[in-house]
């Protein structure tokens, strides 16, 4: 299959190159990838479906949370495999995955709603595939951007991450349109059908844009095939696999600094995910601030931090190591946890982590195997979210008016994570990575 995929991708690139100059083609591919990220976050709108699931389809909240949990598993636990496939066969394969899993899943969901089916298993399977498709489209776009602009890793990584962060805000506004509502609740049949057709179009566009990365891969790996060489004979196996991919990935897995950094990410992102998931309960038991406003503030702060830190990390990397930017982001997060209700500080820290961490990973282990390396790190949000959310739930159930113990614990965990980051940096410094 890899030969045929490479052949199709190379044909698309060759045809487009006759119509558009290479530099302009790269710009178009970059913009399409950003657009893909901008609409990739439909799964982040799951909370908007809850009332329709409960009131229209009669699902219990336990059943609804089972569906949500399966979507998270689909998103996070498949990322290491998706990353390895992207490095081996190119991000175009992930774009195809997004079409294969998004469209049938949303169409089946639409059908289940139209028949008033309460099939929890059906919804669980579909949303698990939707989570997988979300990661496929997002990762394909992220890797495409990173490979098109390898000299500006911070900006190339922060822009798609920023667009993905905005996708929830954009989707929430779109779903306010009367077209998507019936009897003052979301018409899930219409919503799911809309997303199925949307992702068919976006998936095809993403496949075209990610095919252009082949040009960058050939230049990066020194592959300059003769025009008369048959495209299907360019390579006998993985046509886009970086040099020594398997050995480098094994070295990454055996690298103590990788595990140290992973632990730090779990201790960092766990409190942030838990805060975001339980913001309604936190506000209820503290200052009672307006939930929609606080959600908007956190989302805007996170998005702004992703974009700002992406630019800042690129232009300051010659003078200041990105590790110190990460330390600042962690300190901001500690302050946010100690304040308990500061959506701004927690949003800045949350967005900053998802910008600085992948940039550091790309700098230390190489941008050409970033799919495998950063994909492996994506188990951290799943583990961290479960650990700290369960801890919050137990604390809130036992003593709803004394959440200070929870926040002291999360702040302490983030301080410990900062120590782990510095330990990893000490290892990198000894290897010669003084500024990156």
Swiss-Prot record:
UniProt feature coiled coil, ranges: none
Q: Report TM segments.
A: 27-47, 66-86, 93-113, 119-139, 155-175, 188-208, 249-269, 295-312, 325-345, 347-367, 373-393, 410-430
One Pfam annotation reads MFS_1
Membrane topology recorded in Swiss-Prot or TrEMBL: Multi-pass membrane protein
Specify the glycosylation sites in chain numbering: 278
User: Is-annotated flag, keyword Membrane?
Assistant: yes
Keyword entries, A-Z: Glycoprotein, Membrane, Transmembrane, Transmembrane helix, Transport, Vacuole
| Family matches, as PANTHER family | TRANSPORTER MCH1-RELATED (PTHR21576:SF45), UNCHARACTERIZED NODULIN-LIKE PROTEIN (PTHR21576)
Name of the protein in question: Probable transporter MCH1
Task: Specify the species.
Answer: Candida albicans (strain SC5314 / ATCC MYA-2876)
Q: What is the lineage of its organism?
A: Eukaryota, Fungi, Dikarya, Ascomycota, Saccharomycotina
Q: Which gene encodes it?
A: MCH1
